[in-house]
Design a protein with these regions (language model features):
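Charged, low-complexity intrinsically disordered segments
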Residues: 10, 33, 40, 68-70, ...
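Extended boundary segments
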Residues: 59-113
Length: 185
């Protein structure tokens, strides 16, 4: 719930499942991943009180994904490569005019989760479970991810699934993906 992967009502199903488990190796507090204090409030005051506590422990962060515009006629020497290839190609920072904005959304995170943890999660999410209306490629080296933390925007060059290098980036120079063609009736 803290990561936004399920609705709060999912907890009821988890409690039911715990009661029917053959193994009794975990108490309900451990099974739900709650602290003793959270569990006591859950028992004494119910779901609403627990939801309020958990809601106070999470935050929504805006992010954008920028990917290189790749065509059949142009070659980008650092496409799908790490930051050192970008520098070998003569760039100090990713050339924003060669990129397009492919996605902008919010991600739910536990408060206190650092940028690298958020980026690692986005890398997995945008490789394993692409949103239905996502029109970019899976996240890969040479992509740029923007994270917004309370109005402060930070940009990261994707080196690989665990390595994201802070970079300067000018998103207003990026191209927008063309709107999808309307279906003919």
């Amino acid at each position: 719930y803290l990561c936004g992967k399920c609705d709060f009502t999912y907890i009821d199903g988890c409690v039911e499942l715990w009661h029917t488990r053959a193994e009794k190796d975990l108490d309900l507090t451990e099974y739900l991943g709650l602290t003793k204090e959270e569990y006591q409030i859950f028992l004494a005051q119910g779901n609403r009180a627990l939801k309020d506590i958990l809601d106070s422990q999470r935050v929504f962060r805006r992010f954008c994904i920028y990917q290189l515009c790749l065509g059949e006629t142009q070659t980008v020497p650092f496409a799908f490569k790490q930051l050192d290839a970008l520098r070998k190609a003569g760039y100090e920072q990713p050339p924003a005019a060669a990129y397009q904005t492919v996605w902008s959304a919010e991600v739910c995170c536990p408060k206190g989760q650092n940028d690298m943890e958020v980026l690692g999660r986005l890398f997995l999410d945008f490789n394993e479970h692409l949103p239905e209306d996502y029109r970019g490629r899976p996240l890969a080296p040479s992509d740029v991810v923007e994270l917004d933390c309370q109005g402060k925007r930070t940009y990261f060059y994707v080196n690989d699934c665990r390595d994201f290098a802070p970079v300067r980036f000018s998103p207003f120079l990026c191209k927008r993906l063309p709107e999808p063609a309307q279906k003919q009736e």
